[in-house]
Amino acid sequence: MLEETDLIIKKLKKETNEISDIVYREKYICGKKIYIIYNEPLTSSDKISEFIIKSLNELSKDKVKENLLKTISNNITNFKYEIIDKYDTLCFYLHRGFTIILIDGEKEAIVLETKGSIKRSISPPENENAIRGAKDAFIEDYQTNIGLIKKRIKTNDLWIDNITCGKY
């Protein structure tokens, strides 16, 4: 069983050193606080905003006759989803491109598959042939490069932070 949502958020932020890649969106639906959590380089922001956020905004008190968890999982039909009840499972899915919906007061969470696709296929570097090892090259844009790293290393211990050096 999951803990309270605020405790889960604090624990997750502490374990990931509050990196900016993991997005926490807080919303209120039918008077209940929910969190939408996703790992930005690994997910499709279009899928999240077009389908998940839009579906959640369309929920009204009239539609929520049973519990909110069941109503949300029934209304978001475009995705494969799972109901989870363990914190470790939540972290597992978060680092694999899934979006997590936590509902205040619920002991379970909804996990939706919102994996993003890389803009183009990654090809091996043409001037550096390697016999063994990874064939990826960091010649893409920033978000794609971060996504490549996070696809290979799926852990809370990988922290990526943006810093500004010098003046513009």
Model-derived features: where do they sit?
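Membrane-embedded alpha-helical signal segments
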Residues: 1-168
